[in-house]
Amino acid sequence: MKVIVLGSGVIGVTAAWYLAEAGHEVIVLDRQPGPALETSYANAGQVSPGYASPWAAPGIPLKAIKWMLRRHAPLFIKPDGTWQQLRWMWQLLQNCTGTRYEQNKARMVRLAEYSRDCLDQLRADTGIEYEGRQRGTLQLFRTREQLDAALRDIEVLRFAHVPFELLPPSLLTKAEPALEHVKHKLTGGLWLPRDETGDCRLFTVRLADMAAARGVQFRYGQEISHLAIESGNVNGVVVSGVRVQADAYVVALAAYSVDVLKGVLDLPVYPVKGYSITVPIIDEALAPVSTVLDETYKTAVTRFDNRIRVGGMAELVGFDRRLSPRREGTLKLIVHDLFPGAADLSQTSFWTGLRPMTPDGPPIIGATPIPNLYLNTGHGTLGWTMACGSGKLLADIISGKKTDIQHDDLGIGRYAK
């Protein structure tokens, strides 16, 4: 079967890889001149299945107000009066119950754990290198309240058989030796030893090269306009004024999926703006060995080979991609606070990207009411974590194979209930 994949970020490229592996003829279309040049370009770099959690959680509305009042606020909302933003926030509020939080988190952990297994297998099969490390993730708490909140999530980890350790301040160096000098600032940490890190863009570029060697066609610089719908099916995608046709179509355009599907499907995905800095390491002994999550600032500090990436923040500002010097200052403060002397903060590469967020948390993967149209979008901050599992799952669905994990609760149909 001939399949067109719209989008060459980590989600689109992994889908293309697994579709080609399943024997399909695959064409990837993207407006950028190469792969992973938007949302996947400089994300936080963590592959953290155990920390897969929905934003919509009990108490979040009140916490959001408190966060926005902080000097280094992890959250900023700019109401724009659009129906899309208002509806998305209302749907998120409806998911802020204990029952829905547990349900959504379980769905996310299921997919994320599966995805990590798929990544492990892909690495074993191909030998792909992307500055990856298998050294776990450590979530740091600065208050007792944060620690107590994490204890409530542990039951989900137990249910999903995810190994973890709760570490007091004195044992944080078991996971991250460089925290020796700052552990007095912390109340403890939650360590997930099976989590991983890696450069998402490097992974995507190299996997795209491998996919091309398998026959996948990558057509860059293509302005994707809209889907041509005829007799209830997609009969082509209009690209740079030309209709390109296939048997099946996959939309993996992150937050921009909404525009392409306008008038075709009502997609509850909203762009949430995040930031990152990447800095060179000047003292390895003072640098992290893997990923550290700072619960206070809602950021991740991740180690690559010779670089540190600090990523996080959340802004609901539509498709505004302007860089904020204030956000850059906050990210620098975090890496200096936890790992002083580890990096050269005068050599900062500053970036912003738009994460495609669903109001309930899990991504939207699978079939749609249109028989030959499929979705692979809405992964939010967890695109890198969930990419391989999402791609493999989607390829199995399109191929009509029995899937390795339950997926009926990950589709677009869940919003019609």
Curated annotation (Swiss-Prot):
Pfam families: DAO. Pathway: Amino-acid degradation; D-alanine degradation; NH(3) and pyruvate from D-alanine: step 1/1. GO terms for molecular function: D-amino-acid dehydrogenase activity. One of its GO terms (biological process) is D-alanine catabolic process. It catalyses: a D-alpha-amino acid + A + H2O = a 2-oxocarboxylate + AH2 + NH4(+). Its EC number is 1.4.99.-. InterPro entries: DadA, FAD-dep_OxRdtase, FAD/NAD-bd_sf. Its cofactor is FAD. GO terms for cellular component: cytoplasm; plasma membrane. Belongs to the DadA oxidoreductase family. This is D-amino acid dehydrogenase. The gene is dadA.
